[in-house]
């Protein structure tokens, strides 16, 4: 809608004032296209795989306490590329059991608890973007979401944390570049 309004304004300005006056609006339209682009991704057909929720780089991997589920876990932190795609995707297929609920920490309201059909718990945390704009989360309690499906948007990128079960096998290392929905960051392990 925003793109359509910008294009219409550019055409009107072009008609009445000429090309030089309309160039800023055409530039704005191009910027909107770049910021809101959302390419299709090839989602791997591996049921126990955990795919990257965002385009970016792995900045840290640590064993830590999951503040949402109060359990020991592996935390994979991703820094989104400021010029990349800003759509976030579900790392696993499963059911949303807990919406953003904690108000103790400014980062915590954007945590989502996903439980797979096998009973594995994954927490996806979307943190504020570079302009401190709140992430948009499109999923709610009780929703079922597919692996690699769109679940949110962070304006101009930000940081994402994925809390995995402690027994997960990692497929990435610090410094790796990953694409949302298509690159595997871990595999869930069952005894």
Predicted region positions:
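Contiguous, well-folded functional domains in the mature portion of proteins
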Residues: 1-191
